[in-house]
UniProtKB/Swiss-Prot annotation:
This enzyme's EC code(s): 2.7.7.23, 2.3.1.157
PANTHER family hit by this protein: BIFUNCTIONAL PROTEIN GLMU (PTHR43584:SF3), NUCLEOTIDYL TRANSFERASE (PTHR43584)
Identification of the protein by name: Bifunctional protein GlmU
Catalysed reactions listed for this entry: alpha-D-glucosamine 1-phosphate + acetyl-CoA = N-acetyl-alpha-D-glucosamine 1-phosphate + CoA + H(+); N-acetyl-alpha-D-glucosamine 1-phosphate + UTP + H(+) = UDP-N-acetyl-alpha-D-glucosamine + diphosphate
Organism: Brucella abortus (strain 2308)
Residues binding Mg(2+): D108, N230
Family of this protein: In the N-terminal section; belongs to the N-acetylglucosamine-1-phosphate uridyltransferase family.
Chain residue ranges for the region called Pyrophosphorylase: 1-232
Positions of region (N-acetyltransferase): 254-454
Amino acid sequence: MTDRTCLSIVLAAGEGTRMKSNLPKVLHRVAGLPLVCHVVNAVRGTGKSDVALVVGRGAEDVRSAVEKIAGPVSAFEQKERLGTAHAVLAAHEAIARGYDDLLIVFGDTPLIEAQSLLAARERLAQGADLVVIGFRPASPHGYGRLIEEGGQLVAIIEEKEATDEQKKIGFCNGGLMALRGQHALALLDAVGNDNAKGEYYLTDIVAIAHGKGLNVTAIEVPVDNVIGINNRAELAEAETIWQNRKRRELMLSGVTLIAPETVFFSYDTVIEPDVVIEPNVFFGPSVHVASGALIHSFSHLEGAQVGEKAEIGPFARLRPGADLAEKSKVGNFCEVKNAKVGKGAKINHLAYIGDAVIGASSNIGAGTITCNYDGYNKFKTIIGDNAFIGSNSSLVAPVEIGDNAYIASGSVITADVPADALALGRARQETKEGRAKILREKYAAIKAAKSVSK
């Protein structure tokens, strides 16, 4: 396959009116990634392929989203909506460059897998001229039927045009196709619009190709591979299927999920073997968790790196730039953002650590805050190795605390603290014997006077 050139035409011009959204349909997300980007990733999984996007509303946004994951692509606007074959021909310029294979896919089918598309391309390599991707749903009602004779696909018949006998066929059209490049333009140009809607249907090329004596065949893929997204309910269903795939993949690779159905991953989440994830955990984009880590319940991770045997949560939040070394700990009700946490360092309770470096084996007490923002600019806090930050301390950045330094509880630290130093930044306590009794009597009298006046 590696020596066959390929053009993948991604049809992404649909209006998506049933989504009831200002956002183009193909930019809605499954697992944090736009639908169309899932499709492009699947295409790229078949080997080297140029991509031609057929776009409509939000064309530049769609193109930009795809180019973030795939690099430069060609985009062609479908100015009129005259059917699927018409949409493919919007990319006429790209097709005319000449390719061994053409893949025709839809930008709203995020669950298509690379191996399904690769199977279609392999059929082309074996001599087929046109390969249609089909599936067998539990009920074929409403789907176009794939009509086969003698091992060849001869036509696609829509439900409303099918005979009673044809309606019994369970093999249905998934819409996606692979086409030998040398025949592509001739077949597409032969599609007419002699139908009730006056549109050019891509499905017609099956009968056209068969009539020309070409080798036309179909392959079967799992039903979920060809699910199209038309509304928010179907978007949620696709999310569920994607998450279930990812959960199974991770568990089979050696990750323990205590309650799999409650853990949600992003398209690029990487979890190494021997990680344990408790219930109700959410992974945003760009998270890597190293072997042996423990993620407790109700934690939220995004843009974070978690080292070997680190421990997170429960109720912890790791934001972009959080980088935790091995055996470090971020405990309950802690937030870490754009900070490096050294080996064995502990941030156990009720803390905010932002724009900081925490040295190895340092201990950050409960209620510690790095005051990193003055309303205009961010500033950095640097804490050395084996430092102890007492509870309820405020570290006003920019500030540096040396190795083995000790910050007394309740301190507000505004100046650098040298290594091995003790810093106290709080008012001296005053204790006045008997004053509590006097205050109680005073306040009780005031309250009683207010009650009488009412």
